[in-house]
Amino acid sequence: MVVRASDTLQDLARKVRICTDLGVFQSTLTHFPGINPEYAHNCEEERLLGVSMTGVMDHPVLNTVSDEAIEWLVHLRGVARDQAENTAKLFGVNVSAAITCNKPSGTVAQLTNAGTGGLHPRYSKHYVRTYRQDNKDPLTQFMKDVGVRHEPSFMKPDSETIFSFVVESPEGAVMRHDRTAIEQLEHWLMFQRHWCEHKPSITIYVKDNEWAEVGAWAFKHFDEVCGVSFLPFD
């Protein structure tokens, strides 16, 4: 689901209900001819959903660790669970074993200008977003004709083209330099504990002088850390 900066708790709850309904319906599509029947049985038994938030880092409440943010997340997780149980009864299927998550959702984030997806801050106030296009796609020639900046793909120069678009982050958006590595990790932990029934995914930007503290944090929360990767800040 796409989170907008202006969304109230009621707005987000409505989006959670809609996404959960769609997920429960999708979980009924378990006719998988040609593969191991155990796979279909597992899908029918667990009916895992993936109700995820995209645009969190642009939201004034959810982009920061606070008591208010925790209250919102706990409430929204309960909304998702209640909705899944009610909708599963209507369809006559098992209630999902896990519903809520937080994944990068890069394509959705770009299509809706909802940041960089997942729990990641925007890279900077201005940055260049690149897209890879097949040269056989009519859209490729169209974008070339209208003057979109482009260059041959380094890996496949004869068959692919890379297009570049300049992006400006909205006012008030959180940038990578606005958060320390520990602040990013604590934000991830808040979503892990109070929203996600699956594990949230995140890549943490780490400055040279932060690695020791990050290592200590990861050791302290060893039993909870999963789906976390790290990149040098620069």
What are these regions (language model features)?
Residues 45-47, 73-74:
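A short, ordered amphipathic alpha-helix with a cationic face
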Residues 22-25, 52, 83:
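Amphipathic, well-ordered alpha-helical segments in soluble domains
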Residues 46-63, 221:
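Extended amphipathic alpha-helical segments enriched in small hydrophobics
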Residues 30-37, 55-104:
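Internal maturation/activation junctions in enzymes
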Residues 97, 110-111:
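Short capping micro-motif at the N-terminus of alpha-helices
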Residues 20, 47-49, 81:
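Hydrophobic alpha-helical segments
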Residues 1-35, 39, 45, 104, ...:
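Catalytic alpha/beta core of large soluble enzyme barrels
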